Amino acid sequence: MLRIAVQAKGRLFEETMALLEESDIKLSTTKRTLLVQSSNFPVEVLFLRDDDIPQSVATGVADLGIVGENEFVERQEDAEIIKRLGFSKCRLSLAMPKDIEYPGLSWFNGKKIATSYPGILDAFMKSNGVKAEVHVITGSVEVAPGIGLADAIFDIVSSGSTLVSNRLKEVEVVMRSEALLIGNKNMSKEKKEILDELLFRMDAVKTAEDKKYVLMNAPKDKLEDIIAVLPGMKSPTVMPLAQDGWCSVHTVLDEKRFWEIIGKLKALGAEGILVLPIEKMII
């Protein structure tokens, strides 16, 4: 059985639970419980603080972990990145009082910077030849300049609304982060086989994201032109219709190009276009 360490609460918790549910990993409960076993797949989920996850995986307390890249890089634990998951995206940035003009990184020389990520900050400052005084704070880093504890902060930024409410401005993006699936380097053969099945399910879910299944009626005399504008996985499915001169075309479209392609299809005479969501996609 595989043990997966995940964050006990917050945005990463919510998105991790959604991924497991979409991968048909059923959990009996996730509330006020440290360890929960799946009822239909050989995994159990261990709920931890996000900053404890890298160490738990590196030491073998857990076989896998779903953790923010920012925490993984900061902790420098000996675990491997298995998959980038593409959610819980954020950035680690330097921010300063918004009413002070920012001339560049040299401004931080001799300044006090509050952060929960001293390792990443120190490496960045050294690589840019900046000498600053780092104050390590856990939680509510954004209030440090306002109470005179620091001149600036280095912290996670998602929407930027927290900075605005504390009269701060983002001036340097140091790192971009997303959720990672990390693994212990010494998993047994049996656990790796379970991991392969888990990855198969996760890949099917992630591949289907931002994809739509499209069905349409197409005039046969325009079929070649219609197929030419479809960027499907290999080639679209074409089936005859009862009405002479018409056929049904089925394909998969990337949502980013959906309206662009639909417009071209309509111009070529496609009718009765039906669009459906895709839950999972196996290639």
From Swiss-Prot:
Subcellular compartments: Cytoplasm
GO molecular function: ATP binding; ATP phosphoribosyltransferase activity; magnesium ion binding
Cofactor names: Mg(2+)
Pathway note: Amino-acid biosynthesis; L-histidine biosynthesis; L-histidine from 5-phospho-alpha-D-ribose 1-diphosphate: step 1/9
Top-level EC class as recorded in UniProt: transferase
Role of this protein: Catalyzes the condensation of ATP and 5-phosphoribose 1-diphosphate to form N'-(5'-phosphoribosyl)-ATP (PR-ATP). Has a crucial role in the pathway because the rate of histidine biosynthesis seems to be controlled primarily by regulation of HisG enzymatic activity.
Protein name per its UniProtKB record: ATP phosphoribosyltransferase
UniProt source species: Bacteroides fragilis (strain ATCC 25285 / DSM 2151 / CCUG 4856 / JCM 11019 / LMG 10263 / NCTC 9343 / Onslow / VPI 2553 / EN-2)
The encoding gene: hisG
